[in-house]
UniProtKB/Swiss-Prot annotation:
Keywords per UniProt: Activator, Cytoplasm, Transcription, Transcription regulation
Keyword Cell division set for record: no
Gene that produces this protein: crl
Disulfide bonds: none
Protein's recorded name: Sigma factor-binding protein Crl
Domain of life, source organism: Bacteria
Role: Binds to the sigma-S subunit of RNA polymerase, activating expression of sigma-S-regulated genes. Stimulates RNA polymerase holoenzyme formation and may bind to several other sigma factors, such as sigma-70 and sigma-32.
């Protein structure tokens, strides 16, 4: 599948995967790309399959010359689902913001290398973390 005349989906998937462990290929459908980060484990004493994490997820969709994004901060529960939640611990919030900004910068640089821009989606008004100037 070709998303634009110059960028087939297979090549984009390889580039996205090279950004690190963030790409969730199983949740990428057609022209929709899903990335997430399990940044802070809530209880490391639990068995791995029962652990929950604070983290973030970001979804991308292509349009003419750019990708638009929406993202959320929240809890990745033991069932393997994301739930948007307000983070009350300032240290956890800082960690999530730091990892999200770092990923956003690398994603933006990668897209710029193929002459694509990265912009918030038109309907994404409530951005909990400012990602770019």
């Amino acid at each position: 599948m070709t998303l634009t005349s110059a960028h087939p989906k297979s090549k984009l998937m390889k580039r996205f995967a090279a950004l690190g462990p963030y790409l969730r290929e199983g949740q990428c459908q057609n022209d929709h790309f899903f990335f997430d980060c399990l940044a802070v484990c809530i209880n490391v004493k639990l068995a791995p399959e029962k652990r929950e994490f604070w983290g973030w997820w970001i979804e991308l969709e292509p349009s003419a010359g750019r990708f638009t994004y929406v993202y959320q901060l929240g809890l990745f529960n033991k069932e393997g689902n994301w739930n948007a939640e307000k983070i009350s611990d300032p240290e956890v919030q800082d960690k999530l913001e730091s990892t999200l900004r770092s990923f956003h910068l690398r994603l933006e640089e990668m897209l710029a290398s193929i002459d694509m821009k990265l912009e918030p989606a038109a309907d994404f008004n409530d951005q909990p973390v400012k990602l770019s100037a």
